[in-house]
């Protein structure tokens, strides 16, 4: 009788451990992300560390930019006059219709923009419904 009780106890412990292991297993498709959580995951995956790195590099490059308190203002004024006279500045001061040749930018080829938008919408809805992996999210980068 003691042997039967010990056998039942061992089988109960084994089944309990298997049940806990099954509950701890992640979903087969990854993590379910909907709405704002999905967008945050895309931003974190695609640009999080890159933006932080760019901020650090910009801070390092500007470190000794303001070290000299007495800047040569005549030199800066001539650079400003040169920039205002450039074709890039003139392009910025034109109206959008003149810059784009009278055609609004959305009237071009919408297939490319719409195609990438459809991929994003499809992945976001499937990620919300079934879940998605980090590699699927990084495919949007």
From Swiss-Prot:
The keyword Metal-binding does not apply. CDD domains: IlGF_relaxin_like (cd04365). It is found in: Secreted. Disulfide bonds join 34-128, 46-141, 127-132. GO terms for molecular function: G protein-coupled receptor binding; hormone activity. Its main location: secreted. Pfam families: Insulin (PF00049). The keyword Signal applies. InterPro entries: Insulin-like, Insulin-like_neuro_ligands, Insulin-like_sf, Insulin_CS, Insulin_family. Heterodimer of a B chain and an A chain linked by two disulfide bonds. This is Relaxin-3. It comes from Mus musculus (Mouse).
């Amino acid at each position: 009788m003691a042997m039967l009780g010990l056998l039942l106890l061992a089988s109960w412990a084994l089944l309990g451990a298997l049940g806990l292991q099954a509950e701890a297993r992640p979903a087969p498709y990854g993590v379910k992300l909907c709405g704002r959580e999905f967008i945050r995951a895309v931003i974190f995956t695609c640009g999080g560390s890159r933006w932080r790195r760019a901020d650090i590099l910009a801070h390092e490059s500007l470190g000794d930019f303001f070290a000299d308190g007495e800047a040569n203002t005549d030199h800066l004024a001539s650079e400003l006059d040169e920039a205002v006279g450039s074709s890039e500045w003139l392009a910025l001061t034109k109206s959008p219709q003149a810059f784009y040749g009278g055609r609004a930018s959305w009237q071009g080829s919408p297939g490319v923009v719409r195609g990438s938008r459809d991929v994003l919408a499809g992945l976001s809805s499937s990620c919300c419904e079934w879940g998605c992996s980090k590699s699927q999210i990084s495919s949007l980068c």
